[in-house]
Amino acid sequence: MKTPGVYIVEKSAFPNSVVEAATAIPAFIGITENAQNGPDSLSGKPWKITSMTEFQQYFGGAPSPVFTLSVGEAPVEDEKVLFSIPSSDGTKALKVADTENPFSLYYNMVMFFANGGGTCYIVSVGTYAEGAPVDKEKVVAALAALEKEQEITMVVVPEAASTPDCKDIQGQMLAHCGKMMNRFAILDVQPKAKANEVMSEQIDKFRTNVGANFLSYGAAYYPWLNTSVLSDKDIDGSVLVWDKSSTPDLTPFFAPGSKFPKYFEETYSISPPARRS
């Protein structure tokens, strides 16, 4: 930032002979629907893209959102429950909970490009069909592969915070950036381990886990921002599953004569919880 004063700025009459280049090129590591370039597998290989269309071409689409329906005692004191409908006598609650899903890379890419992102690298370390979260050994291999790409300036593993190996993965990210000395790691503070955990406890735990090495090569952004990239067309009855194989009696939750209980019974009576891809 300049201090107050008078400055002389000379404007060139000739066009700029220097070609503009991207100053921030991130590398994203995570789980994708697939990883294919025609007949060639892209699994574990850094792949350069410039748009969401290219991401979908090589790495597929989004994981299917799933919300779990259940009936339990009222009041509801579960942070995973998005909302609940009380029964007429107030003793029961029909709950709609967000199902834990470790696959978030796709939505991070949507946000990246929607906010002006351009050139980046993708390294797929697994698929939705495998049903497993990010594996730390595969992340280590992906980081080793990124050593050959000198233009990368940031490293991101969006799904690391949702795995029990978060500490090790983030440590490896910092070590990689410290070794390369031309990039830094963007880290996430893990979600609450328990409902009554306060913000200071989360931060202290994060600082302990990342250790004391290569801290100048990383940045953590906190608290989390609640947002959504889903549209109306992404939400319909197919995203709801029961937490049990049989449907409970729903008549106490709706007015007499309501068609909703019958609708739920016919639609979801044989829908056990499952992660779909």
Show which residues each predicted segment covers.
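Surface-exposed assembly/interface segments
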Residues: 1-277
